Amino acid sequence: MLTRFRSAVLRGAVSITGARAASTAPVADHKGRVGHVSQVIGAVVDVHFADGVPPVLTALDVVDKLGRDEPLTLEIVQHLDAHTGRCIAMQTTDLLKLKAKVVSTGGNISVPVGRETLGRIFNVLGDAIDQRGPVGEKLRMPIHAVAPKLADQAAEDAVLTTGIKVIDLILPYCKGGKIGLFGGAGVGKTVIIMELINNVAKGHGGFSVFAGVGERTREGTDLYLEMMQSKVIDLKGESKCVLVYGQMNEPPGARARVAQSALTMAEYFRDVEGQDVLLFIDNIFRFTQANSEVSALLGRIPAAVGYQPTLAEDLGQLQERITSTTKGSITSVQAVYVPADDITDPAPATTFSHLDATTVLDRAVAESGIYPAVNPLECASRIMDPDVISVDHYNVAQDVVQMLTKYRELQDIIAVLGIDELSEEDKLIVDRARKLVKFLSQPFQVAEVFTGMTGHYVQLDDTIDSFSGLLMGTYDQVPEMAFYMVGGINSVLEKAKKMAEEAAELEKMRRARVAQASS
């Protein structure tokens, strides 16, 4: 038992060292080398090569179809000995048999890049899955690459306006930065990503790449239809977005590599065409989860909470490639599922250190009916600085956070003693804070079909002026519900006017009934 344990640990060490070497090594003379399947354990396949095993991360093709409708691609992740490689399958291994013939491709998994990919849907291997024929690409690139050198990286501190009030005001996003949307199941991460695609990608001059990592097939279809409706994807004209899917019904190998496939396409637009690229990843936790499954299948000893011992390295290798260079930039928006709403879970906690802005979605906020369910007191942004954003913006944002913090403190007193026991100053703070909370809600354009409310894109200047007026008491006479699920302050005043007219009409009807009853 001890001998097997020691050999398993050594095999894991070999795979890590080999992975670093393979990512930078040129294609060797092992292309076309033939091997045979020697063992199949679910998604893990051992392949024996009489002439020596190819390097780690080499892609292998199973030549014998054995009644399968689709080809099978493997990726070497460990060297068991000089002639045997342990591989992870990118598709299901159903019908795969021992002694099946396997051929080395001579390099990593590669995907098509360039403008020919725009408007198309791909899987982890770069195969088009939208049933629209061949892509006709002129170039393919390997999905494994090293991060740009420090000298080639560039930092930019410009605000990326989203049109979403709570984001633009309290946690502004940075162009060329990495943004995380943290939240448990069903609090609205995907809806916010779809609204950001709608608001930012439509008005964005460059291209966008969307990576669907381990999420629902239905959501992928909805996103594709939404993009066609908004003309981000135009089947008859010029599209601006590429979709790459490795969904939750696929093996862990596909889910563990699909983010690299999408990132490779984004890197081409950044490095070769000098574009400012938007990269959307939904969900980065599924990337970590897939790598954890792969690690368990390879027999590695798990670390904290059952995650793989290489959690930080796996995530770091991906995140360090998402950066801005002197040629172009990649702005990344990543949804991060929080298991059991525990933000200290190793997967989301490890992701925190890579981000420029963190947007925390709170289930308690969602249950109170405020959407987007952002908790402004838990969020942070690197560019929330008066040297980057305007001084007025900074001051208003800080005052909003301060008032919401005071309101949270007063809620405990209200729960015990009631609001009547507060001082007049505190009562005023509570009244304005409740309006602030309602005003942070906003109907989304992508959710119009579900909510029945018209979506709003709010300009940054309008957002700052509206919240500034609310803090100063300009709208103290406006009823609280007029601030709920609206756009800018003009929408608030229109809703308040409509509410007053409806109240007057109801009062008129009541008086008419009273008069009729008395007569």
From Swiss-Prot:
E.C. number(s) listed in UniProt: 7.1.2.2
One example of a Gene Ontology biological process annotation: proton motive force-driven mitochondrial ATP synthesis
Organism expressing this protein natively: Trypanosoma brucei brucei
Family in the record: Belongs to the ATPase alpha/beta chains family.
Signal peptide range: none
Described purpose of this protein according to its UniProt entry: Mitochondrial membrane ATP synthase (F(1)F(o) ATP synthase) produces ATP from ADP in the presence of a proton gradient across the membrane which is generated by electron transport complexes of the respiratory chain. F-type ATPases consist of two structural domains, F(1) - containing the extramembraneous catalytic core, and F(o) - containing the membrane proton channel, linked together by a central stalk and a peripheral stalk. During catalysis, ATP synthesis in the catalytic domain of F(1) is coupled via a rotary mechanism of the central stalk subunits to proton translocation.
Any one GO MF annotation of this record: ATP binding
UniProt main location, coarse: mitochondrion
Disulfide topology: none
One Pfam family in the UniProt entry: ATP-synt_VA_C
GO CC annotations on file: mitochondrial inner membrane; proton-transporting ATP synthase complex
EC top class, as a word: translocase
Transmembrane segments: none
InterPro entries: AAA+_ATPase (IPR003593), ATP-synt_VA_C (IPR055190), ATP_synth_F1_bsu (IPR005722), ATPase_alpha/beta_chains (IPR050053), ATPase_F1/V1/A1_a/bsu_N (IPR004100), ATPase_F1/V1/A1_a/bsu_N_sf (IPR036121), ATPase_F1/V1/A1_a/bsu_nucl-bd (IPR000194), ATPase_F1/V1_b/a_C (IPR024034)
Subunit structure: F-type ATPases have 2 components, F(1) - the catalytic core - and F(o) - the membrane proton channel. F(1) has five subunits: alpha(3), beta(3), gamma(1), delta(1), epsilon(1), plus the additional subunit P18 (Tb427.05.1710) that is not present in F(1)F(o) ATP synthase from metazoa. Subunit P18 (Tb927.5.1710) interacts with the alpha subunit with a 1:1 stoichiometry; the interaction is direct. Subunit gamma is part of the central stalk. F(o) has three main subunits: a, b and c.
Gene3D superfamilies listed in its UniProt record: 2.40.10.170, Bovine Mitochondrial F1-atpase, Atp Synthase Beta Chain, Chain D, domain 3, P-loop containing nucleotide triphosphate hydrolases
Source species, domain of life: Eukaryota
Subcellular location(s) of the protein: Mitochondrion; Mitochondrion inner membrane
Binding site for ATP: 184-191, 216
Name of the molecule in the record: ATP synthase subunit beta, mitochondrial
Membrane topology: Peripheral membrane protein
